[in-house]
């Protein structure tokens, strides 16, 4: 479920990461980014990023919140996400990563942002 709350010149995007199984350890670092990938001839730019630590998570769904500057419509938006046991964010076997790029035309008006992650082997 996505909730949109506009504040002075910004958008708040709430979504969920879905893991295919439990965390390998009791503690993990979560990183989620929103990337503007509109211009094919220019590098994609990170518009918003959030990082946080979860502990003793028994649920396979993790809620995330991104606070971005106002997201214009008619652009190509890409999400990037990782869940790692390493505090530095290095991927190891047993961690989770978003391997399929998911593009939205307007993420703040999308009905549902659910990102399915895959386990790193």
What is each model feature region?
Residues 73-85:
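A short, solvent-exposed beta-strand micro-motif common in secreted/extracellular proteins
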Residues 11-20:
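A short, amphipathic beta-strand motif
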Residues 21-27, 71-73:
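A short beta-turn/strand-edge loop motif at beta-sheet boundaries
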Residues 2-6, 102-121:
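Extracellular beta-sheet/turn segments enriched in Thr/Pro/Gly and aliphatic residues
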Residues 82-98:
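Short acidic/polar inter-strand loop motif in beta-rich domains
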Residues 45-55, 98-103:
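Solvent-exposed serine/threonine-rich low-complexity stretches and specific carbohydrate-binding patches
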Residues 48-70:
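A beta-strand/beta-hairpin structural motif
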Residues 19-21, 36, 85:
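Short solvent-exposed capping/turn motifs at the termini of beta-strands
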